[in-house]
């Protein structure tokens, strides 16, 4: 794979690594190896991740993606990554390498459900810290990706979600009958498609759905070669662990499988894996050549992408030759070399934040001895296997509703339907964010998420009936399928079911909180319904007060309950957190009003549906109060009440009046004001607690319009 002038890969970002043989340890014949000129940024990303890991999760127990000899994993696998994107991608690589055993083992710890409500025992604390820390780091990663390039970041996030949903269903102990079956499994297990999406993000490449379908069969041999090479180089350390653990009966490694399939010893099986890996490598080269000579002859974009993808193959092999992850006896020497390289970077004038933190730590808290591992010298002994997919666990499972004695299919049918519809997951993310400060055990967090989801679903079912709304999240509203009466019955049951869930929190004060906030919520809803039915336009302050009662009620309910049952009492934060909940509720509703007028949202819920429902939204209230003599606008709204809705031309006329009144800009300004309050509140809470909250920051970023 020599460089061709027909491609637009930026060769100034990396250099060819010269070698004396046409292959690399028997692999990669015909492949060119390159190393990124900005490798210090790759090391910076890894170092920053390790710093965050120690802060949010705990001591580092394993080696990551750095290699002082052949180069950082990201520097040799992604030699054409834009320099400004290399650090965050290598942060993600480092997280994936660190995650496998540390958080996995912590997640298997059993929570002591008999502990009191004042403090966590050690096992529970370590588990909660791992779960919270993982969410913090993942949120920080996503936030940085989104802030750099939101459209391509969304592609990465969607790939992440797909990987989670796919790998969660995979049986790690399954038996494989042949190589093809195993390769299909291993491609997903290693997270190769996800790494591919990270490469695209790094280069700023975006493929259409049609282009994605065209390249999938072309790149499959590349994915296969990457996974099998990983098996080859990681086998020795995995084999040692396998023999030491008597309870294991199988290995997810191609070398092991060839030992079983063909009755080979380990060395013979490794040679077989090398043979088939080389076959996949050469197949990928042929695929690229055939594409460039045939259907893709004029498609420089896809040729560039396929060429860049191919550089992962030699980069992965070269990195594997002496990476301490696969060769634990090299840990000490590698740590020393990386320490020297880091100091040289500082002396050369490159002083990013993480390197400064490294210098501070190396002068105080840690050294390079075995007794006190630095960022670089974590143990290499545990699970050397590289599996990006395992680093991103499946989403939390919701607590199911207890079946009724006489059968619950009619009672829960509407509830199950509304629960199956797409959801933004805002309230669940809000709980995760608050828990960074409150540190509730995971079973309590899941209980609160179940309360939030159940209560929200009940609210949606009743709201759609009261608003005469035919759509919910782009699908028919619940009452349009099950009928009004059955939907009301199901929603009412959910309110009772929530009371049972609150009771299970084992704190009587939580039931008081539930009743208080439910009363507030129903009062707020009563005003909304009254204004709509009687055509009485509220003032802006009245409307915002209604939002605080209604929309903010659920946020406030969750906040107060979390503070109440927090293992470390945080009563001093209750006022600040309640204020954050109120402002977030205001922003959420004003944002919803605004998005109801945009094409993106109306595709889900119906074009300007608020006008059909005769609801007074924030922009409409501004227009009516700022232009009290606008008889045309008032006439159209009266027509909506009489006719039960408006046709599209009349809705467009209303939008025109809103624009003329400056109501759209006024709403945007209000959202900006509320977002500033939210941000200030978060910064204040971070200062008060001493804990940065990347989960909340990511939530805020995703809510911005």
UniProtKB/Swiss-Prot annotation:
Pfam families: polyprenyl_synt, Terpene_syn_C_2
Sequence ranges of Basic and acidic residues compositional bias: 349-366
Residue intervals passing through the bilayer: none
Assigned keywords, A-Z: Isoprene biosynthesis, Lyase, Magnesium, Metal-binding, Multifunctional enzyme, Repeat, Transferase
Positions contributing to Mg(2+) 4 binding: 463, 467
GO molecular function terms attached to this record: lyase activity; metal ion binding; prenyltransferase activity
Coiled coil: none
Keyword Lyase (UniProt): yes
Residues that bind isopentenyl diphosphate: 424, 427, 456, 473
Pathway(s) of this molecule: Secondary metabolite biosynthesis; terpenoid biosynthesis
Region called Disordered, residue ranges: 349-374
Residues the record lists as binding Mg(2+) 1: 100
Reactions listed under catalytic activity: isopentenyl diphosphate + (2E,6E)-farnesyl diphosphate = (2E,6E,10E)-geranylgeranyl diphosphate + diphosphate; isopentenyl diphosphate + (2E,6E,10E)-geranylgeranyl diphosphate = (2E,6E,10E,14E)-geranylfarnesyl diphosphate + diphosphate; (2E,6E,10E)-geranylgeranyl diphosphate = variediene + diphosphate; (2E,6E,10E,14E)-geranylfarnesyl diphosphate = (R,2E)-alpha-cericerene + diphosphate
Residues noted as binding dimethylallyl diphosphate in the record, renumbered to the chain: 472, 550-551, 589, 596, 605, 615
Binding site for substrate: 100, 186-189, 230, 234-238, 325-326
Superkingdom of source: Eukaryota
Residues where Mg(2+) 3 binds: 463, 467
Swiss-Prot/TrEMBL cofactor(s): Mg(2+)
Motif (DDXXD 1): 100-104
Catalytic activity, EC: 4.2.3.218, 4.2.3.219, 2.5.1.29, 2.5.1.81
Protein residues bound to Mg(2+) 2: 100
Annotated spans, Prenyltransferase: 332-705
Entry-linked PANTHER family: GERANYLGERANYL PYROPHOSPHATE SYNTHASE, THIJ_PFPI FAMILY PROTEIN (AFU_ORTHOLOGUE AFUA_3G01210)-RELATED
Reported function: Bifunctional terpene synthase that converts dimethylallyl diphosphate (DMAPP) and isopentenyl diphosphate (IPP) into variediene as a single product. The C-terminal prenyltransferase (PT) domain of EvVS catalyzes formation of geranylgeranyl pyrophosphate (GGPP), whereas the N-terminal terpene cyclase (TC) domain catalyzes the cyclization of GGPP to variediene. The PT domain can also synthesize geranylfarnesyl pyrophosphate (GFPP) from the C5 isoprene units in vitro, while the TC domain is able to cyclize GFPP to the sesterterpene (2E)-alpha-cericerene.
Record text on subunit structure and interactions: Hexamer.
Name this polypeptide is given: Variediene synthase
């Amino acid at each position: 794979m020599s460089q061709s002038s027909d491609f637009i890969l930026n060769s100034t970002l990396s250099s060819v690594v010269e070698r004396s043989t046409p292959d690399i340890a028997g692999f990669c014949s015909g492949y060119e190896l390159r190393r990124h000129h900005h490798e210090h940024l790759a090391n910076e990303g890894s170092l920053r991740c390790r710093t965050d890991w120690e802060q949010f999760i705990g001591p580092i127990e394993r080696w990551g993606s750095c290699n002082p000899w052949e180069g950082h994993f990201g520097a040799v696998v992604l030699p054409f990554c834009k320099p400004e994107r290399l650090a965050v991608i290598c942060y993600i690589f480092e997280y994936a390498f660190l995650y496998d055993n540390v958080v996995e083992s912590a997640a298997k710890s059993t929570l002591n459900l008999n502990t009191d409500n004042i403090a966590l025992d050690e096992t529970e604390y370590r588990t909660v810290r791992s779960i919270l820390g993982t969410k913090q780091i993942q949120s920080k990663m996503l936030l940085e990706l989104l802030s750099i390039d939101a459209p391509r970041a969304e592609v990465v996030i969607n790939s992440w979600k797909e990987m989670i949903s796919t790998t969660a269903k995979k049986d790690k102990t399954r038996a494989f009958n042949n190589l093809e079956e195993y390769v299909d499994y291993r491609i997903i297990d290693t997270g190769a498609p996800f790494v591919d999406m990270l490469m695209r993000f790094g280069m700023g490449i975006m493929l259409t759905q049609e282009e994605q379908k065209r390249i999938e069969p072309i790149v499959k041999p590349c994915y296969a070669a990457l996974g099998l090479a990983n098996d080859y180089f990681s086998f020795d350390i995995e084999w040692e662990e396998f023999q030491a653990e008597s309870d294991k009966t199988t290995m997810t490694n191609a070398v092991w499988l060839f030992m079983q399939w063909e009755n080979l010893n380990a060395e013979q099986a490794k040679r077989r894996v090398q043979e088939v890996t080389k076959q996949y490598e050469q197949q990928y080269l042929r695929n690229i050549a055939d594409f460039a000579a045939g259907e893709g002859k004029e498609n420089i974009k896809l040729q560039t992408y396929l060429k860049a993808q191919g550089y992962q193959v030699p980069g992965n092999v070269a990195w594997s030759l002496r990476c301490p992850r696969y060769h634990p006896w090299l840990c000490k020497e590698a740590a020393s070399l990386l320490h020297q390289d880091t100091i040289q970077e500082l002396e050369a004038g490159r002083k990013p934040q993480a390197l400064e933190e490294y210098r501070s730590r190396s002068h105080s808290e840690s050294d390079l001895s075995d007794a006190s591992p630095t960022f670089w010298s974590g143990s290499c002994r545990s699970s050397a296997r590289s599996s990006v997919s395992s680093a991103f666990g499946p989403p939390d499972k919701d607590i199911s509703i207890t079946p009724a004695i006489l059968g619950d299919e009619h009672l829960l049918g509407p509830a199950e339907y509304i629960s199956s519809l797409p959801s933004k997951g805002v309230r669940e993310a809000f709980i995760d964010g608050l828990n960074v400060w409150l540190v509730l055990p995971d079973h309590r967090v899941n209980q609160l998420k179940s309360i939030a989801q159940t209560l929200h679903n009940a609210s949606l079912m009743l709201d759609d009936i009261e608003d005469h709304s035919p759509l919910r999240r782009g699908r028919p509203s619940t009452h349009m399928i099950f009928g009004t009466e059955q939907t009301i019955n199901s929603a009412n049951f959910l309110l009772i079911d929530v009371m049972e869930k609150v009771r299970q929190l084992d704190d009587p004060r939580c039931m008081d909180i539930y009743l208080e906030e439910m009363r507030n919520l129903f009062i707020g809803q009563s005003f909304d319904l009254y204004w709509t039915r009687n055509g009485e336009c509220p003032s802006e302050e009245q409307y915002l007060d209604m939002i605080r009662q209604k929309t903010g009620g659920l946020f406030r309910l969750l906040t107060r309950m979390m503070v109440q049952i927090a293992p470390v009492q945080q009563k001093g934060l209750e006022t600040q957190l309640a204020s954050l909940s109120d402002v977030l509720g205001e922003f959420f509703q004003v944002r919803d009003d605004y998005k109801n007028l945009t094409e993106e949202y109306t595709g889900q819920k119906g074009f300007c549906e608020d006008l059909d429902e005769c609801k007074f939204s924030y922009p409409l209230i501004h227009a009516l109060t700022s232009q009290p003599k606008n008889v045309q606008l008032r006439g159209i709204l009266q027509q909506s009440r009489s006719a039960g809705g408006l046709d599209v031309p009349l809705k467009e006329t209303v939008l025109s009046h809103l624009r003329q009144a400056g109501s759209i800009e006024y709403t945007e300004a209000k959202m900006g004001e509320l977002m500033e309050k939210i941000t200030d509140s978060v910064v204040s809470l971070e200062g008060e607690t001493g804990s940065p909250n990347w989960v909340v920051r990511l939530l805020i970023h995703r809510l911005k319009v």
